[in-house]
Amino acid sequence: MAEGDITTFNAITESFSLPIGNYKKPKLLYCNNGGYFLRILPEGVVDGTRDRNDLYITLKLSALSQGEVHIKTTETGCYLAMDSSGQLYGTLTPNEECLFLETLEENHYNTYKSKKYADMNWFVGIKKNGASKKGSRTHYGQKAILFLPLPASPD
């Protein structure tokens, strides 16, 4: 191409057929901090595990409105929740502490901020050792709050 030449491209008129994620299917939430999957145990403990075959990492994300989700295990039906001290826990009864604001960040990871404590910017997080991180110790820029939703089954 010589200097001063102009390259033109044809207008794209056909629609793109990009694969759209099926949000009805169960997901695994993979944490960027240490490579853990978010796990909600039957007794209410929330932590991370690297075992992809663990029964308690398969999660169902349900949107209540745009950007607001409930997160629960498919195995036990325990909902993810955050209490007034920022501690993550699992509960069988959904309440206002079970609502999270889901945001797709610029790096293509998702963050989940407690709706009830949104003014305090408390996020779901997993520490490098796999333990849950208190919401009061989380903030933007931490790897601990970055989650990648992955399909639970490779279909």
From Swiss-Prot:
Broad class of where this protein is predominantly found: secreted
Signal peptide: none
Protein localization: Secreted; Cytoplasm; Cytoplasm, Cell cortex; Cytoplasm, Cytosol
Record's function text: Plays an important role in the regulation of cell survival, cell division, angiogenesis, cell differentiation and cell migration. Functions as a potent mitogen in vitro. Acts as a ligand for FGFR1 and integrins. Binds to FGFR1 in the presence of heparin leading to FGFR1 dimerization and activation via sequential autophosphorylation on tyrosine residues which act as docking sites for interacting proteins, leading to the activation of several signaling cascades. Binds to integrins.
Keywords associated with the record: Angiogenesis, Cytoplasm, Developmental protein, Differentiation, Growth factor, Heparin-binding, Mitogen, Nucleus, Secreted
GO BP of this protein: angiogenesis; branch elongation involved in ureteric bud branching; fibroblast growth factor receptor signaling pathway; mesonephric epithelium development; neurogenesis; positive regulation of angiogenesis; positive regulation of cell division; positive regulation of cell migration
Organism of origin: Xenopus laevis (African clawed frog)
Family per record: Belongs to the heparin-binding growth factors family.
Protein name: Fibroblast growth factor 1
Pfam families membership: FGF (PF00167)
